[in-house]
């Protein structure tokens, strides 16, 4: 089933199961079936399913998903390899999300940790070159697995584990790190609409307000909210709603960042569930923004990263466009957030969703 004939692939082992099939596998199959060509402008920005199989172990049957090898955002950001421009990454993620939504799929867990980068030319590298590069830059160690509890049944444990390798080091030695393509990966929490899970497993600080207040299940609009938070984090290099300890604080931070909640929302049950006192309720209903948290800081951060002195009229216009896009993505009311196909046409992204431009 591997049409790309890669010499190096990534394996993802699911937890052991008794019956049924891995949900992530069915989602990846659905995405693949809607892709006529691997270089499709939208489908090229989601992880590629290459193959799948099952293995039986002491804990049951494990489904194994075979995909291309990519670099993760988190390993890239702490390396010496320069990250691609945020605007280009955002446009490519928007293309990937459009492909996902056009397949009637909700990703359900979009954040920077689920951003991958495909390295140009890696599919042309043969196995011998890979082994040479790994041997040259990687020091790996094997560690025995020993239970601290002598009475524990260790039949289901491996006899040893291997330390993770310096993947970015040996991949960078083989490929052009200046040409990276951003994509969306990890579909373990994805689902086909309208089959939303009753208790979605989503990053705490990325919960859309309708989910936080238990007003509406997760949906494509929730992905749009997460996309807005993710773009903000790409710019700031820090989560938009950072240093939050609980749901009450998250709601207060949302209001401080975005203003008042919609008046038509029935919040009596939600406010009681969040254990808000009178001062909290007054603050939230007043909807007073806090200058230290407003969206302006995201646009200003991007402006500082790209501007020349004095700033050109184009840079100022682009900064205003970024602010308007984030303001649209991060609307409290789900139905007020634009669908991803409209986001692709936004002035801040439009030129990058039709051609590969690194600005």
What are these regions, as identified by a protein language model?
Residues 1-359:
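Intrinsically disordered, low-complexity regulatory segments of kinases
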């Amino acid at each position: 089933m591997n049409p790309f004939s890669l010499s190096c692939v990534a394996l993802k082992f699911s937890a052991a199961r008794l019956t049924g099939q891995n949900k992530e596998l069915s989602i990846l199959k659905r995405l693949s079936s809607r892709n006529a060509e691997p270089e499709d402008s939208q489908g090229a920005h989601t992880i590629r399913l290459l193959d799948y199989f099952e293995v039986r172990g002491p804990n049951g049957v494990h489904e194994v998903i075979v995909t291309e090898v990519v670099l993760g955002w988190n390993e890239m950001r702490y390396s010496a390899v320069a990250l691609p421009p945020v605007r280009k990454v955002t446009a490519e993620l928007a293309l990937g999300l459009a492909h996902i939504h056009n397949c009637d799929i909700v990703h359900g867990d979009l954040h920077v940790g689920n951003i991958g980068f495909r390295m140009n030319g890696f599919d042309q590298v043969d196995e011998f070159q890979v082994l040479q590069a790994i041997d040259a830059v990687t020091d790996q160690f094997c560690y025995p697995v020993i239970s601290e509890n002598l009475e524990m049944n260790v039949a289901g444990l491996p006899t040893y584990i291997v330390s993770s390798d310096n993947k970015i080091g040996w991949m960078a030695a083989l490929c052009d790190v200046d040409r990276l393509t951003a994509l969306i990966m990890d579909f373990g929490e994805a689902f086909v609409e309208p089959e939303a899970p009753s208790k979605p497993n989503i990053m705490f600080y990325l919960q859309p307000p309708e989910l936080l207040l238990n007003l509406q299940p997760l949906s494509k609009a929730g992905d749009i909210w997460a996309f807005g938070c993710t773009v903000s984090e790409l710019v700031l290099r820090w989560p938009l709603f950072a240093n939050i300890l609980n749901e009450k604080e998250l709601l207060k931070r949302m209001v401080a960042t975005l203003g008042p909640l919609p008046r038509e929302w029935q919040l009596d049950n939600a406010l009681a569930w969040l254990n808000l006192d009178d001062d909290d309720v007054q603050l939230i209903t007043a909807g007073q923004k806090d200058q230290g948290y407003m969206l302006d800081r995201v646009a200003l951060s991007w402006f500082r990263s790209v501007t020349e002195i004095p700033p050109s009229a184009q840079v100022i216009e682009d900064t205003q466009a970024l602010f308007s896009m984030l303001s649209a993505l991060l609307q409290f009311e789900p139905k007020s957030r634009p669908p991803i196909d409209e986001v692709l046409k936004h002035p801040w992204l439009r030129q990058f969703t039709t051609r590969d431009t690194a600005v």
